[in-house]
From Swiss-Prot:
HAMAP family assigned to the protein according to its UniProt record, in alphabetical order: SurE (MF_00060)
Name of this protein: 5'-nucleotidase SurE
Statement: the UniProt record of this protein carries the keyword Cytoplasm: yes
EC number in record: 3.1.3.5
Organism: Rhodopseudomonas palustris (strain BisA53)
Functional description taken from the UniProt entry: Nucleotidase that shows phosphatase activity on nucleoside 5'-monophosphates.
Length: 255
């Protein structure tokens, strides 16, 4: 099995080494094509107005001056040649990708691009506590990732479906289990605009995350609830985003 690994944190991110180790537990034919720079939050951005710069940094390891989507396309359509990948793994992201994160995540977008290309694809993310100075417990993803991937692949990943896997912020032995979940919804906004001033007094802005303690209990069956209870969350996400329920009401209204 030929595996293509990518991420959005950049080619030198520690999580990329973890996803490569997970891939090597499944196959010895592993390729890494990842962004040269951090591309967190770029979603499914595609570079159409700028050329892509490709740099080989080691055997089967490539850096692309582009987005995760660019990397998967370059890997599947150019670098790997006539024999493209049988599996795309995107991650392991530093931080969870759940609820509304799914819309912004370059990690998930990398896996989505693999799915668009007809390749079974997984997005992998490791939750960690922003309130502590400790690094993510990468060993949790490393310990549980290969088994989850094997079982999901044995079950057969449907076309047009990407699997979003999130590992809880705990040691491998503290994981409560694995839950198949649905995408959750936060009860409050989690982005803020931070205004600052440069040396000339002119304003500039950062968009950032609100690091607040969420006291609301996540809805049962969601990715948020699973991680809160120290379960690994496995969420199948479809490319088709049509709201079938509202479509019928809309047809009646517009008829």
């Amino acid at each position: 099995m030929r595996i293509l690994c990518t991420n959005d944190d950049g080619v030198h991110a520690p999580g990329l080494k973890i996803v490569e180790e997970i891939a090597r537990a499944l196959s010895d034919d592993v390729w890494v094509v990842a962004p040269e720079l951090d591309q967190s939050g770029v979603s499914h951005s595609l570079s159409l107005n700028d050329p892509l710069r490709l740099r080989e940094i080691g055997p089967r390891h490539f850096a692309v001056r582009g987005t995760p989507t660019d990397c998967v396309i370059m890997g599947a359509r150019h670098i790997l040649g006539d024999k493209g990948p049988d599996l795309v793994l995107s991650g392991v992201n530093k931080g969870r990708n759940v609820a509304e994160d799914v819309v912004y995540s370059g990690t998930i977008a990398g896996a989505l691009e693999g799915t668009i290309l007809g390749i079974p694809s997984f997005a992998l993310s490791q939750e960690y506590s922003h309130d502590s100075r400790s690094a993510p417990l990468w060993e949790t993803a490393l310990a549980h990732g290969p088994k989850i991937l094997r079982k999901a692949l044995d079950a057969g990943v449907p076309k047009n479906t990407v699997i979003n896997v999130n590992f809880p912020a705990c040691a491998p032995e503290e994981v409560a289990g694995v839950l198949v979940t649905r995408q959750g919804k936060r009860n409050q906004g989690f982005l803020r605009v931070d205004e600052r001033r440069d040396g000339r007094g002119n304003p500039y802005f950062w968009i950032g995350f609100e690091r607040v303690v969420v006291v609301d209990t996540p809805a049962e069956g969601t990715d948020l609830a699973a991680l809160a209870a120290r379960y690994i969350s496995v969420t199948p996400l479809k490319l088709d985003r049509t709201d079938e329920g509202f479509s019928e009401a809309l047809r009646s209204t517009l008829a």
